[in-house]
Amino acid sequence: SELSASVPTTANLSSYINDDTVGMKDDIKNDFIPDFTKELSQWGENKVYGLPMTKSTEVLYVNKNLLEQLGYTTDDLKDLTFEKLAEISQKAYDELGIAGFGFDSSSNAFISTLKEDGKDFVQMDGKINIQNDWAKKFMQFFREKTQSGAFRVVGEDKFLSGPFSNQKILSYQGSSAGFAHINNNDEFEIAVAEVPHFEGKDKAIIQQGASLFITNNVSAEQQYAAYEFIKFATNTENTAKFATSTGYLPVRKSAQDTDTVKNLLADSTSLYGKIYNVASESLKFAYFTPAINNAQSARNIIQEKYESYVNGSITDIDTFINDTTSQVKTSIQRQ
């Protein structure tokens, strides 16, 4: 979920968190996943407007049987670059007649690839980073690979878990929490790998998910009760149970030591176990998008424009850059 730039309607939890009696400062410092809590304190020191409830990142889902049929192994997926993935994907199209790769989220495709060069899609101060050489370069790459049939976009399928389940695409990049929508009927083995990145660029893997907030328009007693509920909901056992039953990642490191998580990781047939291991490793490259006004609207624009450009509806890269920048600017300025 996208955080809004407007936070005054939610309570600053710092006074509770730092309290000697009921606080959880040490837990947040030592046990919560740092990148999950950073997102909720991005407004400055001693300004914490919520705590993470569930978080996901993105992973690469691969049809292992088809991959091997093409002459590759899962070793080829280690530290995978888009350049290598394009080679594999073109072979999938040429030999199997299916696309080799797609992004489940076209907005994440643009935002994460832009972040590989250290740029935020829209900065907290409202600066839009679409008009640059890196955006032009990777968008032209994705267009070329989509036009050749190696890559594809979601389109009318809405999500790529459907085509993947039906073996109509070799691999896709999607949420670590989306595996429940994959139904392969045991017809093929699923491999899970870290998402690809461009050669020579930084890895950038988005983190998303729900957080818990307390509103300002309730009594002090109600706010404190809500804070105690947040503590309860995010304790080690509860974050482990909630995460493993929904496919999300626990928000505490200590969850890995619970029987709930241990049992799943020990189960070699568990797809969640494969995802957990990859996603947990990916967190060292995780980032979050800055909280901006009308964030979801801006995402919708880049989603639509990305797909229009790579599919060929928008034919010129400068038209894509200029139109997208203009529409995003209008969107984030709208009150």
Positions of PLM-derived features:
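Alpha-to-beta junction loops
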Residues: 1, 9, 166-175
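A ligand-binding cleft/hinge motif common to bilobed small-molecule-binding domains
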Residues: 2-5, 176-188
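Hinge/lid segment of periplasmic solute-binding proteins
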Residues: 2-57, 191-193, 263, 277
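Short, solvent-exposed loop/beta-turn-alpha elements that line the ligand-binding surface or hinge
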Residues: 14-31, 77-78, 95, 119-137, ...
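Short helix-initiation/N-cap motifs at beta->coil->alpha
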Residues: 80-84, 152-165
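Glycine-centered hinge/linker elements that transmit conformational signals in sensory
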Residues: 86-91, 125-155
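Extracytoplasmic/periplasmic substrate-recognition and gating elements
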Residues: 144, 184-253
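C-terminal capping/gating helix-and-loop segments adjacent to ligand/active sites or protein-protein/ligand interfaces
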Residues: 270-327
